[in-house]
Structures are given as C-alpha cells and as structure tokens.
C-alpha cells in the first residue's frame, strides 16, 4: 500500500473511532455565567501535594491548588460527551442567535455553486450527511457582533469571552502562584479583571473582533485583540497533490487539542466545498478561509479568468456554510505591483500573486478592491469578519519593510474604515520575513495606519537560513511581535517552504506558537499569565515530576523525554534527572542548603553563637557537603512517601 493510501486509511480510522481523550491528570470544568446556557470550558490541572516536613514515618504535606488553563479542545476532551464526527458538535450558540430575532432560515442555499454540488450524486460518499439549514440576516438587519457592541448590547458571546479570558484566576490564594513581574505593554490596556462591558467596548471601537458566523453555531466564542490573550491560528487544508477530507478533519481535531484558537482551511485541491463542510461541523473554534483559492479552482486555475461574479458566489457559498472570517487581498493595487520588481523574492503570497497577475492582465484594479463595499454587505448578513490580506508581505528578510509592503498596509487601513461603515469586523494581516530589529516598526506602522484594528501575522520569520526549522525562526519573531501588540499569530510548521504539513507537523507548529504567545503575554504583563509558570517552577523545585509534565504545553513529549533515560517507576520520584545526575542536581543541592541554613540558624539562635559564616554560601556548601558524605545521600523518596504524595 502506498504511503498516501496508508495516511488516508489511518485518518479514516481516526474519524470512525475517535473518542474523548482528556489531558493527563486534567478535568474539564465549566464556569457558569449569568444564565444557565453560558458555560465556559476550562482545563483544570490537578497537582500533587508538597512535602513540607515531618518524618519518613509521618510526613507532612501541603496541598497545591489546581491550575486552570485556556482550553480550545471543545468537547473532544469532555468525558461527559460522546464523539460522533458524522453528526458534528453541539450547536452551542444556536439559542443565542435565535433569541435575537434578526435572522431567518432559508428554504434553500443561495450559492449557484453549492446547488450544483448538492445535485451531483457522485459526491454522495464524500458529502457531510447532516447538513444544517442556512441562516441569514433579515432584510434591513445587521447581525455582526460589532453592530451589537456599537448599540450598547452585551451579547452572551461577550459575557462568555470575559469569563474565558479571566480563566478563573480570582480563585487562586497561593502567593507563589499569584506573584508576577510587571510587564511592558507598549500601550495595551490590560485590566486585572476582564468584564463583559470591557469586551463590548473593545469590539465597538474596532480593537478586537469576535469571529462568529451565524451559520457556525458550534463554535465556542473567542476574541482577537491586543488587550486580550495572544491567540494562535493553525493552517490546515489539502493541495492538488496530497491529503484527503479525513486527514484534514484529523488535523482540525489535533490542532484544537494543542491550542489552536482558530483554524484556517487553505485547501487548494479537490472537493474544497465538501472538505470545508466536514471541518465546520466539527470545529469548536472559528474557521477562516481564503475564498480566492476556491474561486481560482472554479476557473480551472487561470487567474486572468477570475471575475466578480465567481468571487461573489464563492463568498456567499462559504458564508452560508459558516466560515467565520475571510482573508481578502483587497489592498494590493495595480500601482503597487511595480514596487516589487527589484525584490529578492517578489510576491510570495498566493493570494497576492493571483491578484497581481489579474491586475496586470486586465490593467485595472482588482475586483476585490472595486467591489469591496459589496463584500462588506455580504459579510454583514452572516457576521463574517474580514481579514485584510497582505498580498505584498516580504518573502525574505532582504525585502522586509519595503515600499510595497507599507504602501499596501496603508490601503488596508483605508479599507478598514470602509468595513466599519457596514459594522463588519476587521483584522489586518502582516508579514512575513522580518529580521528582529525591524519587527517593532511593523507593529507601530500597523497601529498608526490601521486604526488599532487587531494585527495578525505569519511569524514573522527572523532569518531565511532555516528550512526544516522555520517554526523556530518564526517563533522568535512571533514572540516579539506578540509582545509589541500583535493580537494573533499564524503558526508556521517545520514543513514551511518544503511541503504540506502532516498531523505531527501541526502539533509541533502549534506548541511552538503557543510558547511564543505565552512568552508575549508574560512580557506584556497580562494579568495571571505567570500562574502556570509559577506552578510548574514550584513543581520542578520539589521534584514533582508528574506535575511538571502535566503543567507543560506538551505533557506527552515532556514525559517521553524524561522516561527515555529514567524509565523506571522510581524515576518519577527521583531527586534528579539524567541531565545532571544525582551529584550535580542544582535544585537538590539548593534544597539541602536551604534546610541546612534553616536548621543552623535555629541552633545559632539557641546557643547565641555567631552566624556570620552562614552569610557565606561557600561555607554552607562545604559544611553540607561534609554532612552529606558522613550520613549518605538518599536520592529517592521511599515508596511510602510516593504513595502519600499520590
């Protein structure tokens, strides 16, 4: 069997047999809002008790508070739910949408292309079988979260988001968990407690968006904005040469398990429509697309043959399926194309290159630009956010921050104001390849010219010498621009520039970018961002190995790396790891010095002797070393200790 067929078979088996897969030592908890149907999921990580004294026979333990973390995995990690990918996820937001009474159910789909696909019996085996009815705004109504926010309405989605962003941090009482360094926020407004009113205000002023198509009620509300947690997008999608519907659904579930806040389906191969339907019906996170890719497929890949009619039908098709945000490359103008002539890598954006080719072939501005107001009208009927694409982003560090890139950025700022006239939510896409010392300028230019609309960047990659490791070079840039104020980071996988990512590549890209986003939150001083770090550091110092694994971004890999060299069960309670071994573990020695100093200080006080030598850490180390050799060093807790701690 070929590797292609094998991959598809394995993915099909995954879909057919998928069951709930909770994280290790974690439970799904729900925080309730002001009404019973607002239940916000979080992952609660249970921790072992800390040994604080006593004897081997009668140890004294102190409990550690469980730690709650942001959870994007949906019901796929909820033991109370039965997974059935053929019937999709629960329609969480359906009741909220219906009670607003500003939408209506359609008797049939509006897109000509969708009608053709539904009538094609050869697609029956591929088609998602439980198709929902289509919903659209009633005549004269606008159904966007931006519209509601500007009317002063706090929607259930906004309350849900406020609870989600706070992550229950008010419950922590441990001083160790609550300590946090002040950050440098570069002007971001980071309140200690996020309220539903704060969410409404940020959305109303265009500084944040809530991607929430009325035809994707399965999605759990989330927010993108620089005054909130930095988010991460995962790209999936087939190509003309590889992948299948089963594999893309598998990637979706995998990406959300590892922290994907949104997912973009960038499919460019066969059966794009059917692939997207499967993804939407099973996605707990917002789904984005680049409609241009499918429009190009409809004209057999000939860019010059694209036109507004094809594009319009594609937008309606995808909006009625439930796509939450569209990447629209409307800012690439005809006069900007010559600016790229002397670039090292020219135009590297797929969407950008398509538009540039069309503009040159017709010698006029693209239909995305000339029909932008009509695009906004379509988006307003379904609450599809617009992600204004950077078709002229630099594809090499040599081209960073050039005339073409910033000319397009200014046009994106102008289009942002147009979209806001229609109460359509907007985010701005950014680079790309930018060396570290030039990253901050990108954030400053975007804030100035795009009126503080959320920024969403691909990296940026800080060097061009890392094929196979572009997730690392881009993760560096992502952490920096996230710190400066970027609201969402688009992940890069190890396969960037080399091939279509597989399931494992998706995980590596996600973990790398969750790390970058978290580092940015810490640097900004986002309230509560340090709780997880503090909990893990405390577990590390106390040799609570299982807690270290479970608090990490990737418990499976952390555990595997540890067990690779210390596989025995005794290794789980060892006071060292294979990096330093028993004689050179800094934390073990530090613990011993701390205990010795505490004991000696007490003796010194009782006997009224000088304790000057205690101020000399070397003297303390020498004395402790002698004691260590005289009494022998016990490297493991006895089994009884382990049983009690468990």
Curated annotation (Swiss-Prot):
Named cofactor requirement(s): [4Fe-4S] cluster
GO cellular component, one term: cytosol
InterPro entries: ThiC, ThiC-associated_dom, ThiC/Bza_core_dom, ThiC/BzaA/B
Cofactor binding, per record: Binds 1 [4Fe-4S] cluster per subunit. The cluster is coordinated with 3 cysteines and an exchangeable S-adenosyl-L-methionine.
Amino acids binding Zn(2+): 433, 497
UniProt KW DNA damage keyword: no
Residues at which [4Fe-4S] cluster binds: 577, 580, 585
Binding residue positions for substrate: 235, 264, 293, 329, 349-351, 390-393, 429, 456
Alphabetic keyword roster: 4Fe-4S, Iron, Iron-sulfur, Lyase, Metal-binding, S-adenosyl-L-methionine, Thiamine biosynthesis, Zinc
Pathway, per record: Cofactor biosynthesis; thiamine diphosphate biosynthesis
Keyword S-adenosyl-L-methionine attributed: yes
Pfam families: ThiC-associated (PF13667), ThiC_Rad_SAM (PF01964)
Catalytic activity, as annotated: 5-amino-1-(5-phospho-beta-D-ribosyl)imidazole + S-adenosyl-L-methionine = 4-amino-2-methyl-5-(phosphooxymethyl)pyrimidine + CO + 5'-deoxyadenosine + formate + L-methionine + 3 H(+)
NCBIfam families referenced in this protein's UniProt entry, alphabetically: PRK09284.1, PRK13352.1, thiC
Family: Belongs to the ThiC family.
Protein name in UniProt: Phosphomethylpyrimidine synthase
């Amino acid at each position: 069997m070929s590797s292609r067929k094998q991959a598809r078979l394995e993915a099909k088996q995954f879909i057919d047999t998928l069951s709930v897969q909770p994280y290790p030592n974690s439970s799904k908890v729900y925080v309730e809002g002001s009404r019973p149907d607002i239940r916000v999921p979080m992952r609660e990580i249970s921790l072992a008790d800390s040994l604080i004294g006593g004897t081997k026979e009668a140890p004294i333990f102190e409990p550690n508070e469980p730690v709650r973390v942001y959870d994007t995995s949906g019901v796929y990690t909820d033991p109370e739910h039965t997974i059935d990918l053929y019937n999709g996820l629960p329609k969480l937001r359906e009741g909220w949408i219906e009670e607003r009474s500003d939408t209506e159910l359609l008797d049939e789909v509006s897109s000509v292309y969708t009608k053709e696909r539904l009538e094609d019996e050869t697609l029956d085996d591929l088609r998602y079988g439980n198709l929902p009815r289509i919903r659209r705004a009633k005549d004269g109504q606008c159904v966007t979260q931006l519209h509601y926010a500007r009317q002063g309405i706090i929607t259930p989605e906004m309350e849900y988001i406020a609870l989600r962003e706070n992550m229950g941090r008010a419950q922590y009482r441990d001083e160790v968990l609550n300590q946090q360094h002040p950050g440098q926020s570069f002007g971001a407004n980071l309140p200690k407690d996020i309220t539903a009113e704060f969410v409404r205000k940020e959305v109303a002023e265009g500084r944040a968006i809530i991607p929430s198509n009325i035809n994707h009620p399965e999605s759990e509300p989330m927010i993108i904005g620089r005054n909130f947690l930095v988010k991460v997008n995962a790209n999936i999608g087939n190509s003309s040469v590889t992948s299948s519907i089963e594999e893309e659904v598998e990637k979706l579930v995998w990406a959300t398990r590892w922290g994907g806040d949104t997912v973009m389906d960038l499919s460019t191969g066969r059966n794009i429509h059917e692939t997207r339907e499967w993804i939407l019906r099973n996605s707990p996170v917002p789904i984005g697309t680049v409609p241009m890719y499918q429009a190009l497929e409809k004209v057999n890949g000939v860019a010059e043959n694209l036109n507004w009619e094809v594009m319009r039908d594609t937008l309606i098709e995808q909006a009625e399926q439930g796509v939450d945000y569209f990447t629209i490359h409307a800012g690439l103008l005809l006069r900007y194309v010559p600016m790229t002539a002397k670039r090292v890598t020219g135009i590297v954006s797929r969407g950008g290159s398509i538009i540039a080719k069309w503009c040159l072939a017709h010698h006029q501005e693209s239909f995305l630009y000339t029909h932008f107001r009509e695009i906004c009208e379509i988006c307003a009927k379904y609450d599809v956010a617009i992600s204004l694409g950077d078709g002229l982003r630099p594809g090499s560090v040599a081209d960073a921050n050039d005339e073409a890139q910033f000319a397009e950025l200014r046009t994106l700022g102008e289009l942002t104001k147009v979209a806001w006239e229609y109460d359509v939510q907007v985010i701005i896409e950014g680079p790309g390849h930018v060396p570290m010392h030039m990253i901050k300028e990108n954030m400053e230019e975007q804030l100035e010219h795009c009126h503080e609309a959320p920024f969403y960047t691909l990296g940026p990659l800080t060097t061009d010498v890392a094929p196979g490791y572009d997730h690392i070079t881009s993760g560096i840039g992502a952490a920096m621009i996230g710190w400066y104020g970027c609201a969402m980071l688009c992940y890069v996988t190890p396969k960037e520039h080399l091939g279509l990512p597989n399931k494992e590549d998706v995980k590596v890209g996600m973990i790398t970018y969750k790390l970058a986003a978290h580092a940015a939150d810490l640097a900004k001083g986002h309230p509560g961002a340090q709780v997880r770090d503090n909990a893990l550091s405390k577990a590390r110092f106390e040799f609570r190995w299982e807690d270290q694994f479970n608090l990490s971004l990737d418990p499976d890999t952390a555990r595997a790396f540890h067990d690779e060299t210390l596989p025995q069960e005794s290794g789980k309670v060892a006071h060292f790891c294979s990096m330093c071994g028993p004689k050179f573990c800094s934390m073990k020695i530090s613990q011993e010095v701390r205990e010795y100093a505490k004991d000696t200080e007490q003796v010194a006080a009782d006997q009224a002797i000088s304790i000057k030598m205690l101020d000399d850490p070397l003297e303390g180390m020498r004395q402790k070393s002698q004691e260590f050799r005289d009494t022998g060093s016990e490297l493991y807790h006895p089994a009884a200790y382990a049983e009690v701690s468990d």
